[in-house]
């Protein structure tokens, strides 16, 4: 069995693949290393043989997780690393090592699936957009606050904005002007994300006309999916790239 991990700023996304299979036999999202170990330990008949991960966390944090996995399951961990070029994609950053690994792997996965020009939109703690031309050249990208950051900034810096996650979910049942604070905040932030998406689509069309593929990924991609009907929703796009960056066969 192969354990795959995407260690983001706020969550750890994990999945277990049966050897020789590309489909997950178990998967989940947790907030801490301890919760990850507990979730995995609770799986029946778990026999991990290999592990690969991508992390945007500090090296010390990542190293502690690698050690914990080895101690708990006796597994060696392969970690994705920055590259100037891989699988036909050329990193467009002036300093290629400064490009977030999650973005890099999503681009690798997107280019593999598209087999041509693509726009990769990822909605996590931050919202990111990356443009990959048909020849594999990464033209650059954009980063802006994602839904969690926008929501938390308003909650933190505005005294009267207080509500729970259940209220937030109910508020997003429609996008008409809000008649409560929670509706106004949640719908306003969602519309900002959609505006970000539409701007990226306009720029992509200026590059490639209609000859490109749009990929949506990340935990909040469902907030914008109906605004981009031509897009492909690929929740595990980073894992597609991770398998390319850390082949285990």
Curated annotation (Swiss-Prot):
Gene Ontology process terms (BP): coenzyme A biosynthetic process
MF annotations from Gene Ontology: ATP binding; metal ion binding; pantothenate kinase activity
Note on cofactor: A monovalent cation. Ammonium or potassium.
Cofactor dependency: NH4(+); K(+)
Catalysed conversion reaction: (R)-pantothenate + ATP = (R)-4'-phosphopantothenate + ADP + H(+)
Binding residues annotated for K(+), in chain numbering: 122
Annotated positions binding substrate: 93, 100-103, 181
InterPro entries per UniProt: ATPase_NBD, Type_III_PanK
One GO location term (cellular component): cytoplasm
Residues involved in ATP binding: 6-13, 125
Pathway in which this enzyme or protein is active: Cofactor biosynthesis; coenzyme A biosynthesis; CoA from (R)-pantothenate: step 1/5
Record's signal peptide: none
Active-site positions on this chain: 102
Keywords annotated in UniProt: ATP-binding, Coenzyme A biosynthesis, Cytoplasm, Kinase, Metal-binding, Nucleotide-binding, Potassium, Transferase
Physiological role: Catalyzes the phosphorylation of pantothenate (Pan), the first step in CoA biosynthesis.
Protein family according to the UniProt entry: Belongs to the type III pantothenate kinase family.
Name the record gives this protein: Type III pantothenate kinase
